[in-house]
Each structure stands twice: as C-alpha cells, then as structure tokens.
A protein has these predicted regions:
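A short acidic, helix-capping loop that chelates divalent metal ions and anchors anionic groups
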Residues: 1
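Charged catalytic cores and adjacent phosphate/nucleic-acid-binding surfaces used
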Residues: 4-116
Length: 116
C-alpha cells in the first residue's frame, strides 16, 4: 500500500497529468480546440469491498480540473446489481472538487451531463 498524499507521489501524479495534457494538445491540435481529456471517477473497488470511497483522491481531481480536464463516472462493473454502485458518492466527490458536469456515453458519442 502507498500514501497517495506523500509528496513524491503527488509530484509524480502531477508530472503524469502534465504529460497527459501536453500529449492531448499535441495530438488534437486545432482540430479539437476547446476539448480536453476525460478522466474517470471510479467506484469499482467499493462494490468489491476494497475501498470505501471513489477514486482518484480529491486532490488529483482538483489537479485535473485546474488543468481543464473533464470527468465521467464509472463503476467498472461486470454485473447489473453493481452497475451504479456508490454513484451518489462519486457525484458528491465531483461536486466537492468543483466539477458541475460529467461526460456520458450515448449513441452519438460523449455528451455533457449536468450534475446540478
């Protein structure tokens, strides 16, 4: 196990985010101006009894938001009965981190969905 608040972990996570966003900009360029990578808030470990809170940690979500990232909520479920496990907790986490919208997948592709 590791401490996700340890300064070395935080620095590594922020460097990874910087690389993700730089790569996104390089690969998308002007063709996708205004778009941003989508990250997930995941509740799968809750349904499996491994965690009690969604992940990633709030500070990581705040770093994603500060860089202009978008989010979606996912349960990583393979069973109908856990498909929306802890989604209210994930929505609260998103709102607490400053997100007001999430991405959802529709037949037309990714669309915005308001959390408020």
């Amino acid at each position: 196990w590791f401490d996700e608040n340890h300064p070395r972990y935080r620095a590594a996570a922020c460097r990874a985010l910087d690389r993700i966003f730089a790569s996104w900009q390089e690969s998308r360029g002007a063709a996708r101006a205004g778009s941003a990578p989508i990250f997930e808030i995941n509740t799968g470990a809750i349904s499996r009894g491994w965690r009690t809170t969604p992940y990633p940690a709030p500070w990581i979500l705040q770093e994603i938001r500060a860089r202009g990232g978008q989010i979606m909520i996912n349960s990583d479920s393979h069973a109908v009965d856990t498909l929306t496990c802890a989604f209210p907790d994930a929505v609260k986490l998103a709102l607490d981190c400053g997100f007001t919208r999430v991405k959802i997948i529709t037949e037309q592709g990714f669309e915005d969905y308001s959390l408020i």
